[in-house]
Amino acid sequence: MIALIGNLSRDLKPGRPPFVGGGPFHGARALQRLRVPARIVARCAGADREALLPPLVRLGTPVRYVPGDATPTFGIAYDGDRREMRVEELGDTWAPSDLPPLPPIGWAHVAPLSRHEFPAETLAALARRCRVSLDGQGLTRVPEVGALRLDANFDPEILRHIWTLKLANEEAEVVGDPAALGVREVIVTHGSRGATLYTRGTRTDVHAHRIDTDPTGAGDAFMAAYVVARNAGFNALGATRRATAVVAAVLARG
């Protein structure tokens, strides 16, 4: 069994009402296709629960709701695969005590929306239960309201507690050489074009057929599929290939 853990977001795009986002939601879109044992641990402000939680629950994976005080809110616009974002509100920070009891799990993917959400001590507590993968947003996104900024001023202690790190292209540019981070598996995703895996001193490109559609959540769907494959016994390269194919199917479905 695997778990997806993170804050739900309230996303704003031109020409449409606010809608649910965040790693738990977009990862659940992949889990809906894979139909494997999994749990989702999701958090948002109590005032937003009725708006944000039902769309997640409808995707079919059992959900554990963690009450929160704030809901991360983003304004989002795309130019092809290039995303422009504005932070309207920051979400809650998770303490170790916020991690609920779960059935035995082999892997958990943690999907922060900003650097402050999952500090090293919380990841350390989770790593005592299972292998942990982390979205690079939890390293590079500066926790402030306004135009989204990235920098490399993260706590390096975080890297000690994770097995796999997923970076988008722009995050990889900020942190530097992925192979030098000291993480067992680093995956750099390239939007709809595939991914690059760094592991055991090797670099492997995994290509995908480009799909002209909104790529929001592609990285979250990728990592949900990746940890499912790793938990099922795939090696890192096999899991990367599997996740690339799953993301293509999820994006094609819309």
Predicted segment positions?
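Conserved N-terminal subdomain of the carbohydrate kinase-like
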Residues: 10-18, 33-111, 116, 122-131
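Active-site metal-binding loops of divalent metal-dependent hydrolases
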Residues: 7-8, 221
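Extreme N-terminal starter segment of soluble prokaryotic enzymes
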Residues: 1-3
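Alpha-helix C-terminal capping segments
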Residues: 28-37, 229-231
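Conserved beta-alpha-beta core of the PfkB/ribokinase-like small-molecule kinase fold
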Residues: 107-179
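Conserved phosphate-binding/catalytic region of the ribokinase-like
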Residues: 177-254
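Short beta-strand scaffold segments in enzyme catalytic cores
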Residues: 29, 74-77, 194-198
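Well-ordered beta-strand positions
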Residues: 40, 163-164, 185
